[in-house]
């Protein structure tokens, strides 16, 4: 294990770091694009797995283009909403990454924990409330905030 003695601030991602939820989202993308055929599903799955930290707001328009589906703002939002309905409860129910829950509870007073995720902000906050994590993190950043900008803002705010 890495020594934490020299750190005050720790950034956390969510999927695959706090909860074992990467496969939940992979399966949801495949389910969402299943009507478009196996070739599109395979392309979507491979892209998602290679670009895990990319927001669904960036992925879904790309996947719609691959599927040959008209992608106006309303259609993109429709697919994003469907995706959210598929994943939210499954993410909450997914297994914790081993040791993370205990670590977060044990060290929430010692460190500044900041959650930075590509999951939409309101959905991420709902998930964190359901998991009793809102008191663990000093700040929770979700999409449309980029991870890079969220980290930069935090480092400025905490003068790191």
How should each PLM-predicted stretch be described?
Residues 41-54, 61, 65:
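N-terminal polybasic phosphate/anion-binding patch
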Residues 6, 88-115, 125, 149-152:
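Short, acidic loop-to-helix structural element flanking the phosphoryl-transfer center
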Residues 1-46:
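Active-site neighborhood of HAD-like aspartate-dependent phosphohydrolases
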Residues 32-34, 55-71, 154:
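Helix-loop "lid/cap" segments that line or gate small-molecule binding pockets
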Residues 24, 55, 95, 99, ...:
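Short beta->alpha linker loops
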Residues 26, 30, 53-61, 80, ...:
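An amphipathic alpha-helix signature
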Residues 114, 120-160:
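Substrate-recognition "cap/lid" segment bordering the active-site pocket of phosphatases
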Residues 64-101, 111:
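Metal-dependent phosphoesterase signature
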